[in-house]
């Protein structure tokens, strides 16, 4: 299990690239990477974008230390 930041960096993506792919703001992604809780729909959008990047399903609960409110 990897953190949001690890998943993003391993794809070679910047925060801006993940923001573009997910439709989530850079600020929200940065906050999520620092452990600040995010809404369930935000977590799903991030997981969906990462899933497309990796070519495999990633669920929000698969992302280590992602806090969901």
Map each language-model feature to its residues.
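DNA major-groove recognition helix of helix-turn-helix/homeodomain DNA-binding modules
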Residues: 40-58
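Ca2+-coordinating acidic residues in Ca2+-binding motifs
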Residues: 28, 42, 62
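Residues within the helices of the helix-turn-helix
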Residues: 5, 16, 30, 44
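A short, Lys/Arg-rich alpha-helix, primarily the initiator
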Residues: 1-11, 17, 21, 58-61
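Hydrophobic alpha-helical segments, especially transmembrane helices
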Residues: 6-9, 27, 40
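Recognition helix of helix-turn-helix/homeodomain-like DNA-binding domains
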Residues: 23-38
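Short glycine/serine/threonine/alanine-rich loop segments
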Residues: 13, 24, 52, 56
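Short amphipathic recognition helices of helix-turn-helix/homeodomain-type DNA-binding modules
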Residues: 57-69
